[in-house]
Curated annotation (Swiss-Prot):
The lineage of its organism: Bacteria, Pseudomonadati, Pseudomonadota, Gammaproteobacteria, Alteromonadales. This is 2-succinyl-5-enolpyruvyl-6-hydroxy-3-cyclohexene-1-carboxylate synthase. One of its GO terms (biological process) is menaquinone biosynthetic process. It comes from Shewanella sediminis (strain HAW-EB3). Pfam families: TPP_enzyme_C, TPP_enzyme_M_2, TPP_enzyme_N. SUPFAM superfamilies: Thiamin diphosphate-binding fold (THDP-binding).
Amino acid sequence: MQIDKTAELNLLWGTLILEELSRLGVQHVCMAPGSRSTPLTLAAAKQSKLKQHLHFDERGLGFMALGLAKTSHAPVAIITTSGTAVANLYPAIIEAWLTQVPLVVLSGDRPPELIDCGANQAIIQPALFAQYAKQINLPTPDIAIRPEALLTMLDEAISNQSLPVHINCMFREPLYPSTMSADFTQYLSTLGNWQHTTSPFNQYGKTSQHSLPTQDSLARFVHGKGVIIAGTLSPQESPEILVELSQKLGWPLLTDAQSQLRQHSGVIGNVDQLLHQPKARALLAQAESVLVFGGRLLSKRLINFLSEQKWKRYWQVLPQQMRLDPSHSAKQVWHSSVAAFASQAWPRSSDANWALQLIQFNDGLETLFQQQIDNAEFGEAMVVRAIAKAQNRQSQLFIGNSLPVRLYDMYAPITPDYPRTYTNRGASGIDGLLATACGVAKHEGKATTLLIGDISQLHDLNSLAIARTIESPFVIVILNNDGGNIFNLLPVPDEKLRSDYYRLAHGLEFGYGAAMFGLAYNRVDDFESFNEAYQEAIAFQGPSVIEVSVAQHQASEQIASIATWVKQS
């Protein structure tokens, strides 16, 4: 290949890569500007089957892709240039790996002769993500390498993949073709019918990893008193079928904030607080069997209950082989979808309805929350409950880490309608939460609310640039308690240490940040103002910011007060 055709061959390889990704189910491509990734960028720009999303910051870009992949339930491509641009994706890649979300990183790179020799913007990119991504290292485009070798490498790496893949793409200059005069007809002729179809070059059948118990095993398992626990489940996993299973067995269904069922009227959603209550805890202690769907439970009290209880039978259902049990309990792990496992011919338990009193206890807590939160002083828990009540089956709720997700888990109301719920609880970081929520909002354009703390929002402030591109209702509710006030709940030995080294009060407001990016903004410090601002924002076709100003100790003091009431109830 003559040197003046290098740019055209680079672009051809980029085109083959992006075309095959679209055939492998990729619907979205997220791109940051950069020169070394030009062959990929130009190919993506002309690829009509991929929806393009652009952002200048690769860290936010990676998290936006994560949100898109969560909601589309399909792999999302990310294009970056070389150097630290790629490294900025690392937090999002870690979160994706831990939560089994497929991302495909396409990183532009210098050719081998420019690595480790002082060349500009060149780092060692292969294996940059260590164990957190499957690694594919492509050679520089070469006419001697048949195009089907490139396609089959992509097909094997991405088909049936639920984890991140890093495809490192080395390109020699020139990168910008002035013309497309090179004739690659003969080079592409070995692809045969691929050029006239819409299918991947190699097609892999779906891998079935279902392992299901026998009818005899089911009968033995349901003998006695048991509970069902719904951990982290996606909306696509049809978790509602667990309500039917609970009713069929006559066992209570205890739900985590991330189960999609936390607000459902047919479940025991207040389990975190019920485990504070002596009567409820004593009743739950009678359970002999437990059936856990998913993992990554939020409530420490529920995790401790699972760990401390002497189970006769402990089953956990996961979509594939992995360890999701920090207590390391002895158990039978089944690999199955939620729907396949729950829809078996389950017999009714010999001790059906053994824990009906839990419904009373659960409803009693809801009454207590109405008194102690909804009709008390304005604060974070009141806002969380109000937002939860305002959702419906068509809306999406992204809940930020630290205090917001814990308030939702502890106090979310029982409602006839409830949203699709999303979190980033793999590594549980406070980075990239706004960007991930933007990705969630962008896929289908459903009304989306983000509940986020002030420190988390400061951490991801420049992702307001992504938010401004959203054309559907997208409400960013910032709970501003002036610092990391979740540390008020932790046993830091000295109040000055807590203030100086953990809480980090900043005294900042977000009005100028919203104005910088041209976003509608309201700052509220009472419920009437919040409710009015939220109703206006959720009806607006675009992004809005609502800053909720609350005192530093309001939430922690209220949590302690409610815990006292619960223990006495």
